Amino acid sequence: MSIRSNFVRLLKKQVNIIKLQKKCSHSVAVIGAPFSKGQKRRGVEHGPAAIRSAGLIDRLSNLGCNVCDFGDLHFSQVPNDEQYNSIVKHPRTVGLACKVLAKEVGKAVGAGHTCVTLGGDHSLAFGSITGHAQQCPDLCVIWVDAHADINTPLTTPSGNLHGQPVSFLLRELQDKIPPIPGFSWAKPCLSKSDIVYIGLRDLDPAEQFILKNYNISYYSMRHIDCMGIRKVMEKTFDQLLGRRDRPIHLSFDIDAFDPALAPATGTPVIGGLTYREGVYITEEIHNTGMLSALDLVEVNPVLATTSEEVKATANLAVDVIASCFGQTREGAHTRADTIIDVLPTPSTSYESDNEEQVRI
């Protein structure tokens, strides 16, 4: 990377930080999406409640955010929702849920909020990104996950739609997507150059083929080991923001973290992100000043073996979201009663000094 490009990035980063300091109050919409039909394991529908119970709303408020918690959406189970092609599960139910979520995310972003969607399983990202794109058609996506979620309905080995949302989003893959029941409303809204993956370490054969043959950018855990997370983020921003600033949609699956940190999730894969790597990603996204919407998905309290595992996973989810809005590891004090402009200076003499002289 040239010295000039490094200087330009540093200058843009400083300008964005100044903008963020001036705009100390983000307007944040929180939408709960308690949905689980994109996969087979019960409990992920309780993710929004677990994240809220871990103190999300208070944490965001203490960061100076104006938080509008819109509560949880209601998702209907479509009756007689037969499998597509004898493998794709709950297509009508998932399609309807994504349509409902797309509408609500679009409304929130259109009203000027940064939208936080609490999942729920990752099939929901098709809805949240579609709704976001309706308001911000030039958006880009950073997908942080152990999995690529880019199988098509014809390549999926499991039939679970939480492993397929990206294939529905990409224009380049639309000739590979059959007409799935429940998705007739859906239109692709991304090009392959609009998305970057971070944290991958469990890919199906068809996903490997798609990523390599369609030249989709991704950084696996091996890339992170070799390059370091700072370089990964620099290259990510070079691709997505190098030519122009544009809205960022962050889709963050909690299983991107190592299972030792996030045990309460449905598809854990050993060797994931450390706390420092994961939070560095979100701190750097915050510093761009371009975050417009984010998903935090796949927290599943039912799969934890102890209450401590539930707490650890939910607290980690809160830290991820909070660092998207200014929480840093140096501390983030934005409320008026915590900001210090001048350090106190002692006076030249104290009453205790005079008393000491009298005593002498």
From Swiss-Prot:
Expressed at differing tadpole stages in tail, intestine, hindlimb and trunk region. Strongest in tadpole tail. One of its GO terms (biological process) is urea cycle. Keywords: Arginine metabolism, Hydrolase, Manganese, Metal-binding, Urea cycle. Substrate binds at residues 147-151, 158-160, 204, 267, 298. Mn(2+) 2 binds at residues 145, 147, 253, 255. InterPro entries: Arginase, Ureohydrolase, Ureohydrolase_dom_sf, Ureohydrolase_Mn_BS. PROSITE patterns: ARGINASE_1 (PS01053), ARGINASE_2 (PS51409). Binds 2 manganese ions per subunit. The keyword Isomerase does not apply. It is an enzyme of class 3 (hydrolase). As well as its role in the urea cycle, may be involved in tissue remodeling. Homotrimer. Belongs to the arginase family. This is Arginase, non-hepatic 3. It comes from Xenopus laevis.
